[in-house]
């Protein structure tokens, strides 16, 4: 059979928003208007280029907040030649894929989940060819995406089936399922079927389709609920999908939303099944607690423009919504730290008006004293214990907004974390809001987690004001503080987080665990908390008869969902905890999370899924991967791959190597190690050597604003002469970009991406292009590699091979700076300090001890130095022969030229 793609292929795209978005390639033509349900519709051809979607179904089963989704689509190719189908998937970041399968010609091709270390081998092979194997990620605010292209045989059909799972989170007093429907093509059988089972009973259920006229929505959306069960069915006919009576385009273009909540007549909602339990805690009819809240706001120069405008708009609205019993203050931090009052004041009408005037009037500063701003806000809240005891029963909250990294005062992230942790001491939660993409979000997440809060990214968009208000609305009404949920110690073998600093109106606390054998019947939960003016205490017992009844009604699904809910929450918590522990404990947590991911068949940041029996033109299997916040996804660059079933695999092809234009004159370090500094302002070059012992690690580039760094470790000759200084060279380089958790370790033997995360290992025999969240690495076979950082610099590592039979010398590396103009003014290091203009004057040129190398007097940094004119080699363009560079040589390890002594640049680690 012919596996070639026809002139036009069908594109079937499935996007998931919170749950799933479905999208297919548009049919020819465009809609001219919305249809009216009363208009008579004509039969139309639903095929595009001989391919039509026979069915597209989303089946969602929810059992006690645990949602299990199966998305099935069948595509039929009626053409006499093969067609290409692209299956694009966007899933919420909170979801775990558990299955993906493709069925064609009676054969099933099933996903196989493995640990990611094993899957890296697949990544490596795909990267070497400069293409992708279904791994390209394009994440939106809450989404993750992958794409699989498949060639479909003529006169045949193919069925895709995706399964994924998640725990629904309660916000604003309801659970919400949003499905964005956008087929752009008429579907013979389109269906969304949502089945809900909640043991507490369903108190409300609604379903809406923003894209349907009200009359048509009433005809096509069927919704019902009674007792424990709820059901929503959306099954429009082909004629009901048409955008106009004679159109072949679809009006299914918008959000399909299902919202529901459960009955809260009983405070206790405790399920026990199959030696696992799930406890849902969301008591009603509690009095809102008064709160003490301090807003800590970044007013550095980078906030100018829309950011500060939107921040002010949000603050004005938030202040207007505060209750008279609340107390508050505002702290602003730039280069300096200033507070509005310096202590908590009541949210009276006069104070709120004055605070709003303060917000309207503040102006921006320059740098970012994040540490100072946070400590000032913490100090204000801590005063409650010392000087305002009447406010000690309020719920205290600290909210910080920043759009960048610390650049003033304390800038070391580990020290800031320690300072904040020691100052808060567990008294109240810290919520960090990271505005835009230039913020170190992992840093904010760790800080929030260490202090009983959470971090949220605010996207730089037209709705940033609403994003800020939306976050505040979630924490605006605390009902309980210090919520402690306890279970019998002799009965519980494993437990998710059971202590929460605060419980807010409209939310829900979920705890799950594993129970020892024979302990189910006596299982109970004790809850203690502090409320407004009173203590909260309750004991929940398992109702055995009710559980038996539930098991009869829902059977295996209830047992299975309670256990998988526990596994889901446990894995999520283990992954989060990894961010704030040392390397040894991180490895232990990773091992636990990996084993659970494999046991329960979840695609998590530690696992990947490949599809057996499916391959592309180079024999690669498609791989489904889930990126994590602390280890961004690897993206292979190049043309997309089209996968075919095992019977249709064409012969392998090879991609061309990647080339990159290099500047005429560069700054770098090479050979023994000779530092070459090009000074464009003088149209001249300086050079110096560093004489140190093998094993020493030197800081070459360090940008404190971004954390970007390059360190190099020296190696010596294989055979060393006693009592003599033998040559040293760079044998290991570490390039790190903490903003994206990027690390690259380079040696003359291997190139390792993210070595701390078990990343892929490439050899110098590979030709590869890889991208990780704004960093592109190009490996040019047996020659060099180029690292390009968005909003940063471009750097080259040159490989030097020596004669294989040499008993003295060994392979080494050179490092060159190709572009540094976007690096910050604070960049330092043996090379980095010269990214900025440097002034010097040369005079009194006269013959030196070597007639071919004149000496001279150089005045630099207010020092007079004796320098020598000489030649060095630049290997950035020609790694084998190099090009001679004439330079002024500064003696004694660059003394007088470099800032401080060369020993100041010795660092303990490669990263």
From Swiss-Prot:
Record's comment on post-translational modification: Heavy chains are linked to bikunin via chondroitin 4-sulfate esterified to the alpha-carboxyl of the C-terminal aspartate after propeptide cleavage. The S-linked glycan is composed of two 6-carbon sugars, possibly Glc or Gal.
Disulfide bonds: 244-247, 268-540
UniProt motif Phagocytosis uptake signal: location: 181-184
Annotated VWFA domain residues: 290-450
Modified residues (Aspartate 1-(chondroitin 4-sulfate)-ester): 672
Coiled-coil ranges (or none): none
Signal peptide: 1-27
Family as reported in the entry's similarity comment: Belongs to the ITIH family.
Oligomer status and interactors: I-alpha-I plasma protease inhibitors are assembled from one or two heavy chains (HC) and one light chain, bikunin. Inter-alpha-inhibitor (I-alpha-I) is composed of ITIH1/HC1, ITIH2/HC2 and bikunin. Interacts with TNFAIP6 (via Link and CUB domains).
Protein's name according to its UniProt entry: Inter-alpha-trypsin inhibitor heavy chain H1
């Amino acid at each position: 059979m012919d596996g070639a793609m026809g002139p036009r292929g069908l594109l079937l795209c499935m996007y998931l928003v919170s749950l799933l978005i479905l999208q297919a390639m548009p049919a020819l033509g465009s809609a001219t208007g919305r249809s009216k349900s009363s208009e008579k519709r004509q039969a139309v051809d639903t095929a595009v280029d001989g391919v039509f979607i026979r069915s597209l179904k989303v089946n969602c089963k929810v059992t006690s907040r645990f949602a299990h989704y199966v998305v099935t689509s069948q595509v039929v190719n009626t053409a006499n030649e093969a067609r290409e189908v692209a299956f694009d998937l966007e899933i919420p970041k909170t979801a775990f894929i558990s299955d993906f399968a493709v069925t064609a010609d009676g054969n099933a091709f099933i996903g196989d989940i493995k640990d990611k270390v094993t899957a890296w081998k697949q990544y490596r092979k795909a990267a070497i060819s400069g293409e992708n194997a279904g791994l390209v990620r394009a994440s939106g605010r809450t989404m993750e995406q992958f794409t699989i292209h498949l060639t479909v045989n003529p006169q045949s059909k193919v069925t895709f089936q995706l399964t994924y799972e998640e725990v629904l989170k309660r916000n604003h007093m309801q659970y919400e399922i949003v499905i964005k429907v956008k087929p752009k093509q008429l579907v013979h059988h389109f269906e969304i079927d949502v089945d809900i089972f909640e043991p507490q009973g369903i108190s409300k259920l609604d379903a809406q389709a923003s894209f349907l006229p009200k009359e048509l929505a009433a005809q096509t959306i069927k919704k019902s609920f009674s007792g424990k069960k709820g059901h929503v069915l959306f099954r429009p006919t082909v004629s009901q999908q048409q955008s106009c009576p004679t159109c072949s385009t679809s009006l299914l273009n918008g959000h399909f939303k299902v919202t529901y909540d459960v009955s809260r007549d009983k405070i206790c909602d405790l399920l026990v099944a199959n030696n696992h339990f799930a406890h849902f805690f969301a008591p009603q009819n509690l009095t809102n607690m008064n709160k003490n809240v301090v807003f800590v706001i970044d007013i550095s120069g980078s906030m100018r423009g829309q950011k500060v405008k939107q921040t002010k708009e949000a603050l004005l609205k938030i202040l207007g919504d505060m209750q008279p019993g609340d107390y508050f203050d505002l702290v602003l931090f730039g280069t300096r730290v200033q507070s509005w009052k310096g202590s908590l004041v009541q949210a009276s009408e006069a104070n709120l008006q004055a605070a709003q005037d303060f917000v309207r009037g503040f102006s921006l500063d320059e740098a970012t004293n994040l540490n100072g701003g946070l400590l000032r806000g913490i100090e204000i809240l801590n005063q409650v214990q010392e000087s305002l005891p009447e406010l000690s029963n309020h719920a205290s909250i600290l909210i910080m907004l920043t759009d960048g990294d610390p650049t003033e005062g304390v800038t070391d992230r580990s020290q800031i974390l320690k300072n904040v942790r020691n100052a808060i001491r567990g008294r109240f939660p810290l919520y960090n809001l990271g505005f835009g993409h230039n913020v170190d979000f992992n840093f904010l997440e760790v800080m929030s987690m260490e202090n009983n809060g959470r971090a949220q990214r605010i996207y730089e968009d037209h709705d940033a004001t609403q994003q800020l208000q939306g976050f505040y609305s979630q924490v605006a009404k605390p009902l309980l503080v210090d919520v402690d949920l306890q279970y019998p110690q002799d009965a519980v073998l494993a437990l998710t987080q059971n202590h929460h600093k605060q419980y807010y109106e409209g939310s829900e606390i979920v705890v799950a665990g594993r129970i020892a054998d024979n302990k189910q019947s006596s299982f109970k939960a004790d809850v203690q908390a502090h409320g407004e003016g009173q203590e909260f205490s309750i004991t929940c017992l398992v109702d055995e008869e009710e559980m038996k009844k539930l098991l009869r009604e829902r059977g295996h699904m209830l047992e299975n969902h309670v256990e998988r809910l526990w596994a889901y929450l446990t894995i999520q918590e283990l992954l989060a905890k990894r961010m704030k522990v040392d390397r040894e404990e991180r490895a232990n947590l990773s091992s636990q999370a990996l084993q659970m991911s494999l046991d329960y068949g979840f695609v998590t940041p530690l696992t990947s899924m490949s599809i057996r029996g499916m391959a592309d033109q180079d024999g690669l299997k498609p791989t489904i991967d889930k990126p994590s916040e602390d280890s961004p996804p690897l993206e292979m660059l190049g043309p997309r791959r089209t996968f075919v079933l095992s019977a249709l695999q064409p012969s392998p092809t090879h991609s061309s190597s990647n080339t990159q234009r290099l500047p005429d004159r560069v700054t770098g370090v090479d050979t023994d190690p000779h530092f070459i500094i090009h000074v464009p302002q003088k149209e001249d070059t300086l050079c110096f050597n560093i004489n140190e012992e093998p094993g020493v690690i030197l800081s070459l580039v360090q940008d404190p604003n971004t954390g970007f760094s390059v360190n190099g470790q020296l190696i010596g000759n294989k055979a060393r002469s006693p009592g003599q200084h033998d040559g040293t060279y760079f044998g290991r380089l570490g390039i790190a970009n903490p903003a994206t958790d990027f690390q690259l370790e380079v040696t003359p033997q291997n190139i390792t991406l993210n070595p701390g995360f078990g990343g892929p290992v490439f050899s110098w025999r590979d030709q590869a292009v890889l991208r990780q969240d704004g960093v592109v690495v190009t490996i040019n076979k047996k020659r060099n590699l180029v690292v390009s950082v968005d909003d940063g610099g471009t750097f080259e590592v040159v490989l030097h091979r020596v004669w294989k039979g040499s008993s003295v010398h060994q392979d080494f590396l050179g490092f060159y700076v190709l572009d540094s103009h976007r690096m910050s003014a604070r960049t330092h290091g043996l090379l980095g300090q010269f990214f900025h203009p440097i002034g010097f004057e040369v005079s009194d040129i006269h013959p030196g001890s070597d007639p071919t190398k004149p000496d001279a007097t150089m005045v630099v940094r207010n020092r007079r130095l004796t320098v020598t004119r000489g030649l060095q080699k630049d290997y950035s363009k020609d790694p084998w022969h190099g090009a001679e560079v004439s330079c002024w040589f500064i003696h004694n390890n660059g003394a007088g030229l470099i800032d401080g002594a060369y020993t100041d640049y010795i660092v303990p680690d490669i990263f």
